[in-house]
């Protein structure tokens, strides 16, 4: 039996060494140490031997079993080490290679314009207000003197939202930031109720939405609207404030501006503001006018006492003019090559 045991050890060591993966190794383990393995069969045969021989051979078989288990464990460790070395080699980093520079982010060009507009108007005493992008039909249209049959109320021009507010008013994505002017003015009036009320001076930048999409229009765009209401604010103030804003924004004193008569439901009189552009061409850059008496009433103000002006400008258009960009869609495509020009 001694020769058989030595052969089992030799066979087990050879079989384990030939196993190139854990699955094969486990199969070889079963051949020697499993329920029907060679060593297990020898242990079962001990019962047929006399007590003295059984004791001697049992000790010998257990010794051989320990040798086989040691060979098995050694091969397991060798396979694990080989797997780890292969993984480390695959994930190795060559520390002599040049490093990758960390790229720096920058403000989007429209956000640069947004911040610049806030800075310019802030320097002459205008507050900055923000409001909800989901507005009520009343706040977006009715409070601003838009009649019920106004084309802007149609689903071809406005994104309506399912559901209504707590007062059963229709909900929509605001088409301009003018609703925030109404909200701000009402809060201003309530704040100074029974007191001497200072003028209302505020700009409202923010995202707005309209059903439109081409090279010069987007269904989502950014707008800034301004409002100045007091007891002696005139159209001349509007011309002075907006002309001064354009000169500071474009950093030019020779900018030519004209106010062209127009119509907007929320202002009377109304004007479109054009800026000289190119070779004798004029480009519309803003809508404006004196706040309509009905809008003043909806703000909680007496139109016989208070007067003021409002204007609204697209931030994308201002950005396009400032940087010479000819396609509005570039702002929304996320092309890093385009955005890096403003880093």
UniProtKB/Swiss-Prot annotation:
**Which Enzyme Commission number(s) are on file for it?**
6.1.1.20
Query: What does the record say about how the cofactor binds?
Result: Binds 2 magnesium ions per tetramer.
The cofactor(s) it depends on are: Mg(2+)
* PROSITE patterns, sorted: AA_TRNA_LIGASE_II
Under catalytic activity, the entry for this protein gives: tRNA(Phe) + L-phenylalanine + ATP = L-phenylalanyl-tRNA(Phe) + AMP + diphosphate + H(+)
> What is said about its interaction partners and assembly?
Tetramer of two alpha and two beta subunits.
Its protein name is Phenylalanine--tRNA ligase alpha subunit
Q: What is its main location?
A: cytoplasm
Residues involved in Mg(2+) binding: 268
User: What organism, scientifically named, is this protein from?
Assistant: Cupriavidus necator (strain ATCC 17699 / DSM 428 / KCTC 22496 / NCIMB 10442 / H16 / Stanier 337)
Q: What is any one of the record's Gene Ontology cellular component terms?
A: cytoplasm
Give the EC class as a word. Answer: ligase
Q: Which biological process terms from the Gene Ontology are attached to this UniProt entry?
A: phenylalanyl-tRNA aminoacylation
The alphabetized UniProt keywords are: Aminoacyl-tRNA synthetase, ATP-binding, Cytoplasm, Ligase, Magnesium, Metal-binding, Nucleotide-binding, Protein biosynthesis
Among the GO molecular function terms of this UniProt record, one is:
phenylalanine-tRNA ligase activity
User: What superkingdom heads the lineage?
Assistant: Bacteria
Keyword S-adenosyl-L-methionine assigned to the entry: answer is no
- NCBIfam families associated with the record: pheS
